[in-house]
């Protein structure tokens, strides 16, 4: 059945789909205000609101801000609810709101639901499956224990996103991968472990993302009581970028449409950024058959002219493809070609610096995009550009929390306060802690030629100086640190025979740290500190914050540490209450330190944005990060175009993800099907990125990869087809 009031808006990248959706949303608000007599009827009856869904949280914030700007321009606001959310956020909220209904339906214990974050989920699942892992029931060739556990949990999430019962996962894997070797036994073991995991979580009221998604589509959405409440809450649904949604969202939208809600959906055939991560574009595309169809066509970037030519070059690398009548010199392309990747990174940094210095482009108009950015590449580019005073924004960079010296210092502090954690300490970590914790604005020394408080000093995100430098910290640790497994201690400074060599500031700072540790240790012994998260909060207030402006990265790390600690202790308290046990606090602290040192937890910068000047910063991102952020820049530098990762999808594809597409027949996964999938993904990537580059595309290639292997990826045909040989040098033609 086609709903005449509902609209399916289809268009390529940057053709105005979101703007059209906002237009429809504002029209709906205006029509409703007029129909309901200025909103007075809404206020009296509490009539249904509007459901607005975006693909990611960043898209949701952007859409919400744009809608708010339009409302402010109108000078009027709707008097009913406008819910802005993401698919996963919607599932989570609905499961929490209707948890009593699920408790009644599934006969669960009446625990208040507690969300479990992915890193905690990994730790709990590993502990639960320890016996199966040790006995070899869960073992896959060339796969570590950590990755295998993550794969099993991801399979549960993929099945839930498709709307597939988790009991069918072993059979689906067997149909897809065949009956070779011991794989059927492995699939059955995975299924048994997932059943055990699901029951274990439900008994304790713990909800992972996968479990919340499964509870929503399998138990909540079919429930007639919930359906009645759902359809009465929303009279219209607006979904942006539906090509990034899981298949079960189509079931949700169809229920709302059948109940009379008006729908507006946008779809990008060249999108599918989250294909391989649970999104199912083909399943959502079928929703368009039930709506009026609108197609948007608007030239954007280089796609209109060079998108079809790029696909020709992929099919036939031998041709020199360019628009008719356009000479090579007029093409908006250049190349940087070197022998080694180290040379390539340096040359790329030099060319960016030269272009900015000559005024050809601003830093905020440049994006460096790569199929995969390792830590060395990030550091090299950021260090090189920073040396030229060019700001760099590493998009969604998620470094492990433990990589921050401040976080390591706080973990060391925990090990000194709580007993039985001496095995986590060494002399270097204690010395580092002394340097970090002795920071204070009072220690800022005068800068040559400038007073201590020069104009603008208070606005700069510069951490204060340390009263204890590295040399003094080393001397203190050598003479005043008493290592011990049970109770390591920092001894009084006068234990050091030549403590006078430390100086007054260092001595006083050290004494303050020791006194604070002893005071907190006494409170721990008296059980006056409920959890280590309280101790961390006190330590940050005492030693780190000082009311000063910390660097953006350090603020993000501290906030994530506190959030992680609070979450970890909430989960631990739930488990101890359920099991009716009372573990010593130091045991939980030790497990928390071990979890952080594994490097699985990273700092997420939202909602703090790094400050830049008016010219912005050079964006550094992977393909997936850049496309997910839906950015556009005048200049693009495509790194490692000879890398096979352009074709393979890299980390943006979960294990067995194509098998979980709703419309895929259950048949063995073949190499031909894999090749077709990779080629389709590459075509989408090329069209999408070409739509996001405005004036200039620089192809960056090194003959050898980091591991010394020759690079012969599929995008090398672009280099030969678009850039003349005399321009494909280390110094590109501009």
For each feature predicted by the language model, list its residue ranges.
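Helicase P-loop NTPase motor core
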Residues: 13-32, 300-388
